């Protein structure tokens, strides 16, 4: 057993609230006195349908989702949505637009570009030579008014960038399609500013295995009949999310996280905590006299994924190893970026972030 509390800084699958894990443990063999474990429930049973509907309603309440938006709990991860969004919403359009600001929006752009009938235009990109150190302001996006949609990622998990203000377009412009995987539920925003939102659960929602999709009803009229039903949003909605067997346990766990977030005071309250957590780490980095480096423009720094390095690869490796010995786990940066990355999603307690900041100062004292 570790001498220290274990804090999981993984980018995903990520930390889950301790209270949620405790509830799941208590209900593992017998959910709510039914005698059934959730993992063994039929997805069409009244027991599971109640879990599904409560999860949907709680998410709708947390995000203030308008009535003219549908919520789906799908499979395939956010990467499936790169193509699924385009397959459903670009039909009959000559162009669609994409904003590339980091690793995942770049992959989304590349995947969408494989569609043969719709040209995916690069409306904006992050920095010279795609160095991803800054974010192009929304007013600089080269958006074609007659495009099918504009796709972007509001928070870049790998590169550690995040739009300070959640982007929105003026009335009459194409609908925004947003990858919110690594920031959904971390701060308030207006769902009505978007045509479609998707998010892999394994960061701020729950365990891996489910992807949340929030889509405006009028856009479902675009869904073509000549794509496979399993990739058609309308097919899933027409069957109340039961076109195929959903990820029942992941949905159950996500529902527990929604209830936990409500108990914390909702999104507005958790946003204040998230702001303090990010401030704690960035002040430690900026106050290190250059020992720790974060090259991201300050106004574009992510509050969810804090990236940093020492400038010495061997010292970075030592940092990750020594941190893990003190219960500060999974801090290694993404393979294409290197250095360290602290993912501080909703479920990461402030105590964990303060423990990391203390370790960073101690490490600098010993190796600086």
From Swiss-Prot:
Organism: Neisseria meningitidis serogroup A / serotype 4A (strain DSM 15465 / Z2491)
Keywords from the named record: Amino-acid biosynthesis, Aminotransferase, Cytoplasm, Pyridoxal phosphate, Pyridoxine biosynthesis, Serine biosynthesis, Transferase
Major localization listed first in the record, in broad terms: cytoplasm
PROSITE patterns attached to this UniProt entry: AA_TRANSFER_CLASS_5
Family: Belongs to the class-V pyridoxal-phosphate-dependent aminotransferase family. SerC subfamily.
Catalytic reaction(s) noted: O-phospho-L-serine + 2-oxoglutarate = 3-phosphooxypyruvate + L-glutamate; 4-(phosphooxy)-L-threonine + 2-oxoglutarate = (R)-3-hydroxy-2-oxo-4-phosphooxybutanoate + L-glutamate
Binding-site list for L-glutamate: 44
GO MF annotations in UniProt: O-phospho-L-serine:2-oxoglutarate aminotransferase activity; pyridoxal phosphate binding
EC number(s) stated in the UniProt entry for this protein: 2.6.1.52
Function summary: Catalyzes the reversible conversion of 3-phosphohydroxypyruvate to phosphoserine and of 3-hydroxy-2-oxo-4-phosphonooxybutanoate to phosphohydroxythreonine.
Cellular compartment(s): Cytoplasm
GO biological process, one term: L-serine biosynthetic process
GO CC annotations on file: cytoplasm
Co-factor requirement: pyridoxal 5'-phosphate
Note on how the cofactor is bound: Binds 1 pyridoxal phosphate per subunit.
Residues found modified as N6-(pyridoxal phosphate)lysine: 203
Binding positions for pyridoxal 5'-phosphate per the UniProt entry: 78-79, 104, 157, 179, 202, 244-245
Subunit structure: Homodimer.
Record protein name field: Phosphoserine aminotransferase
Cited InterPro entries: Aminotrans_V_dom, Aminotrans_V_PyrdxlP_BS, Pser_aminoTfrase, PyrdxlP-dep_Trfase, PyrdxlP-dep_Trfase_major, PyrdxlP-dep_Trfase_small
HAMAP family xrefs: SerC_aminotrans_5 (MF_00160)
Effect of residue 237 to L: In strain: B293, Z3524, Z3910, Z3915 and Z3918
Domain of life per record: Bacteria
Pathway(s) where this gene product acts: Amino-acid biosynthesis; L-serine biosynthesis; L-serine from 3-phospho-D-glycerate: step 2/3; Cofactor biosynthesis; pyridoxine 5'-phosphate biosynthesis; pyridoxine 5'-phosphate from D-erythrose 4-phosphate: step 3/5
